[in-house]
Amino acid sequence: MSIRIASHAGFCFGVQRAVDRLEKALEGARGTNRKVYTLGRIIHNSHYIEHVKSLGAEEISRGDIPEIIKRADEGDEITVVIRAHGELKEISDSLYSCAERNPAFTLIDGTCPYVRKVRDIARENSGDGRIFLLLGNAAHPEVEGIMSCAEGEKYVFPDEKSLENAKISLNSANFCAKTLSVAAQTTQNLAEWKKSINFIKKVYTNALIFDTICNVTQMRQEECSALAKESDVMIVIGCRDSSNSMKLYDIARTSCKRTYFIEGIEDCPKIDVTDLKVSITAGASTPYSLIQEVYKTMNEQNENFAELLESSLKTLNTGDIVEGVITSISPNEIHVDLGTKTT
């Protein structure tokens, strides 16, 4: 058995940047009256969420913001951390405004620089005479934040098929009379993006195309695809709420039928991987410590299988009478499986 860990598995730059800032804020607040809040889950990983909760982080929702700002204006020392996905423009604006006027309130904007770039594109390429299209999951926090930065006519599409269904609209006088700009959620499937762009170019030749899938996502997906083609078993670690993790799972199982999606070591498949090639990859919100735990667990399971096999084999002594199973017969010999260490 061989187990490989993908070189691009685990925290990406944007996630690492956000969690580093959160942990620094928690360290600074230790022993003080300052409260540290994350606006939503800082990352899509339940193991890490429990870790930062133990350090004092508390999770709030958008609906809590008015009360948080009110408390800060009354003198409470408060820090709010925006996650790597970014936040709705109106929410961010109100938090920045509070931070500017109130020294007791600290805002840590952990929005990933790649996500910020897409938000800028949405703002600069929307409004009068323009239509903004975004490839992504409309319910994803990153997409919600990006679309809140776009003015006027704007649409989210999940895949090329949805564009085909909207072909009549794309060919309409309304679309043709306006400048069409197209971007993507930073963690989108690269293959789906290429198909979508090719389709748009066929029906709308003057579209402005912005390639906004982050390069780490591209490398992670390409490596996952290559490993899946070479592996007997693929393990994808992540959270089912994580867009990039689920896309890795979809990519892996295209080429490797024995692909398992797990969130932690408790989900590790109990399978015999003796003589098999196993590869492990993980989403951008997966701590490397968890990847190492899964690697260790898979190795230990394989050792246990080997020990069980060894203990199940009998040792024969001269004069023993045993039962066996004939496995093959040829003109010159008969093969019998005696369930022993030697034949």
Question: What role is predicted for each listed range?
Answer:
Residues M1-N299:
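The feature marks the mature, well-folded catalytic cores of soluble enzymes
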Residues E300-T343:
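Single-stranded RNA-binding regions, centering on S1/OB-family and related RNA-binding modules
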